[in-house]
């Protein structure tokens, strides 16, 4: 699969993939997350703010620990567009951005923005994951493991927090889901 991406690289797609790497990386995604957390908190949706912070922060911590356990080397750096430090498995970009996308989907699902946010969250997570393979810095299994780990983490966190903070099941605007 990495060979297919390598064979189909173009300057335009490479610029897009590099932009996704920056926006979804450790310097920008935390700022986006913090801005949304602050907005939710100011709007009185404190359970939602806490959930988003724990979802993305917890996925990041889980990623660091998992990388230290597996210590999988990255794909051949001579074939990669970017040089990334550290281990490959699981993809930190895929994990953090999947956690972000899943969390904002769960937060806004019951609001008017539900479907658009769900679609944007899913598309964003997929694009960041694909970009990691396109850039040659991760194997497909790294990206898949990162996304699936975040799915389990974020949904598990949502179910657990929903038991102790029932307001999390409603929209940030205060509507409640009684299903």
Predicted feature locations:
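Membrane-embedded catalytic cores of phosphoryl/pyrophosphoryl-handling enzymes
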Residues: 79-179
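N-terminal transmembrane-helix/juxtamembrane module of multi-pass inner/ER membrane proteins
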Residues: 1-28, 68-81
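Alpha-helical transmembrane segments of multi-pass membrane proteins, especially transporters
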Residues: 3, 51-56, 124, 146-147
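Membrane-interface loops
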Residues: 31-33, 40-115
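Membrane-interface helix caps of multi-pass small-molecule transporters
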Residues: 4, 64-65, 159
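Generic hydrophobic alpha-helical segments
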Residues: 37-38, 130
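Surface-exposed charged/polar residues within alpha-helices that form helix-capping/stabilizing sites
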Residues: 3, 22, 39-40, 106
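Hydrophobic alpha-helical transmembrane segments of polytopic
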Residues: 25, 29-36, 56, 117, ...
């Amino acid at each position: 699969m990495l060979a297919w991406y390598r064979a189909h690289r173009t300057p335009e797609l490479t610029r897009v993939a590099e932009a996704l790497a920056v926006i979804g990386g450790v310097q920008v995604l935390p700022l986006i997350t913090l801005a949304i957390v602050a907005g939710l908190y100011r709007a009185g949706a404190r359970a939602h703010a806490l959930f988003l912070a724990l979802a993305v922060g917890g996925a990041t911590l889980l990623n660091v620990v998992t990388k230290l356990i597996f210590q999988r080397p990255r794909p051949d750096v001579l074939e990669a567009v970017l040089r990334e430090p550290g281990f490959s498995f699981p993809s930190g970009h895929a994990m953090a951005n999947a956690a972000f996308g899943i969390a904002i989907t769960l937060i806004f699902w019951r609001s008017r923005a539900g479907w658009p946010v769900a679609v944007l969250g899913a598309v964003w997570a997929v694009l960041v994951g694909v970009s990691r393979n396109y850039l040659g810095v991760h194997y497909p299994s790294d990206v898949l493991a990162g996304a699936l780990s975040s799915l389990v983490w974020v949904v598990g966190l949502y179910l657990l927090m929903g038991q102790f903070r029932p307001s999390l099941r409603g929209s940030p605007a205060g509507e409640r889901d009684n299903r």
